[in-house]
A protein has these predicted regions:
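Hydrophobic packing segments in regular secondary structure
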Residues: 1-34
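Peptidoglycan cell-wall recognition and remodeling modules
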Residues: 27-149
Length: 149
């Protein structure tokens, strides 16, 4: 009887731990936020890279889509090479999330521009030839895409 009670208690503890893990994941914690932090850290190391229209890498420069494509490719995710491609991007199962649920690491899309949400109403992007790649406040009303998680 004691062994059965102990086994039942262990099963209840496992179920409670699993429920807590699922609740944390639904609240934006867990692995998706950990990967989001990795995406942000990786993207931030490219601050200062020059803007080159049509560019695709940090050594020769990139445009906004080249930057986001390069960063997400590092994490094994494919993204379009043109901003217009995001109109059909709701392909591949990427999830559109409301601004109230955005998380660091989410891709941001505006007509003609993309960036990566870094948290605290900030994002990093390749802007233009005079600004290059830098982190700035979120502007306008972008679409947020959950690429990972």
């Amino acid at each position: 009887a004691a062994a059965q009670a102990a086994a039942q208690k262990q099963a209840q503890e496992r179920a409670a731990a699993e429920a807590a893990r699922q609740k944390q994941a639904q609240a934006g914690g867990g692995s998706s936020s950990a990967v989001g932090a990795q995406i942000v850290a990786y993207a931030r190391q490219f601050a200062g890279v020059r803007y080159v229209w049509g560019g695709t890498n940090p050594s020769s420069g990139w445009d906004c889509v080249g930057f986001t494509h390069y960063v997400y490719a590092h994490f094994g995710r494919e993204t379009p090479r043109r901003t217009g491609g995001y109109l059909g991007q709701f392909w591949k199962g990427y999830k559109v999330v409301p601004a109230s649920q955005r998380q660091p690491g989410d891709l941001m899309w505006w007509p003609g521009h993309t960036g990566i949400y870094t948290g605290n109403n900030m994002h990093i992007a390749a802007w233009n030839p005079s600004m290059g790649t830098q982190e700035r406040k979120v502007w306008g009303s972008p679409v947020y895409l959950r690429i990972i998680g």
